[in-house]
């Protein structure tokens, strides 16, 4: 495995320069584009990594999985009364579909759906941002995981479209807490800084029927784990989920910080990071690396 990871990074590194770092979030635009890391975490606890796998980066939308898992943990099936689990086929920050469907988001991984999940968690936790940080620390086994305050503030200052979604949902009765407070929590989640190794460890319960071996916790039931993985497979990579299924064939979740996490049910979790994005907002080099890894080991679930 170690030799394979090294080989794959060597093969995809020439692709650096063909994408573009996220520039609509000023604090992310400064990230050096030539960084590249990958980590694989096995259900037996073995970790393999290569490149910049220990370098923390902004997880961005990858955090939506953690928020969803929190909400399922305390509210179960009730959360689906407020949002769906269908692919959207629209950009992740679209207002058009949200208006047409009367404020009920298609799934928890588009921005509107993630905001509803944060609203649900806001009603449950006295300090949602701290609760999320501590939850992710337990899952990753890294007590040094922190929120990048500069990134969170940068995103809050550019919150107009997310605020519009929240207020639109509020007008349909599908948003219950103070919009600005929920936005603060949401951006705090997105601004978590984690490495490839951190994220591969943190997602390991999704490859192990909901059980996190290193923390000894049953995070989700087996059925809930299957449900989360299925939504990742259909909606985890914005409007490029079909292409990811075709090329990689695994449940996955990406973020505009350049990270992609993928789950090999029953076996492994993988995280790859390269800051340059393709036109769909997913890591260009990361997609290529995961495609090679999945093909060469035969990991596709299809």
Curated annotation (Swiss-Prot):
This is Glutaminase. Keywords: Hydrolase. Substrate binds at residues 61, 111, 155, 162, 186, 238, 256. GO terms for biological process: glutamate biosynthetic process; glutamine catabolic process. InterPro entries: Beta-lactam/transpept-like, Glutaminase. The keyword Phosphoprotein does not apply. GO terms for molecular function: glutaminase activity. It is an enzyme of class 3 (hydrolase). Its EC number is 3.5.1.2.
């Amino acid at each position: 495995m170690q030799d394979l990871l090294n080989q794959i990074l060597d093969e995809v590194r020439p692709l650096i320069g063909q994408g573009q770092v996220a520039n609509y979030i000023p604090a992310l635009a400064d990230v050096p584009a030539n960084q590249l890391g990958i980590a694989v975490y096995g259900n037996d606890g073995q970790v393999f990594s290569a490149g910049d796998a220990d370098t923390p980066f902004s997880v961005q939308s990858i955090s939506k999985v953690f928020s969803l898992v929190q909400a399922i943990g305390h509210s179960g099936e009730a959360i689906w009364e407020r949002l769906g689990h269908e692919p959207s086929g629209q950009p992740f920050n679209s207002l058009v579909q949200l208006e047409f469907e009367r404020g009920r988001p298609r799934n928890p991984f588009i921005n509107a759906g993630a905001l509803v999940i944060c609203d649900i968690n806001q009603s449950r936790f006295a300090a949602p941002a701290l609760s999320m940080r501590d939850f992710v620390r337990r899952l990753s086994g890294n007590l040094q995981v922190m929120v990048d305050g500069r990134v969170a503030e940068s995103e809050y200052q550019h919150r107009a479209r997310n605020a519009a979604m929240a207020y639109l949902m509020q007008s349909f009765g599908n948003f219950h807490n103070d919009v600005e407070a929920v936005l603060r929590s949401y951006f705090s989640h997105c601004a978590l800084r984690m490495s490839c190794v951190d994220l591969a460890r943190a997602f390991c319960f999704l490859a192990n029927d909901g059980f996190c071996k290193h923390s000894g916790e049953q995070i989700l039931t087996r059925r809930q784990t299957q449900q989360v993985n299925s939504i990742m497979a259909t909606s985890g990579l914005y409007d490029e989920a079909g292409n990811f299924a075709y090329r990689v064939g695994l449940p996955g979740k990406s973020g505009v910080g350049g990270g992609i996490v993928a789950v090999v049910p029953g076996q492994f979790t993988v995280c790859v990071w390269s800051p340059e994005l393709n036109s769909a907002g997913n890591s260009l080099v990361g997609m290529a690396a995961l495609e090679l890894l999945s093909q060469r080991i035969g990991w596709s679930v299809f």
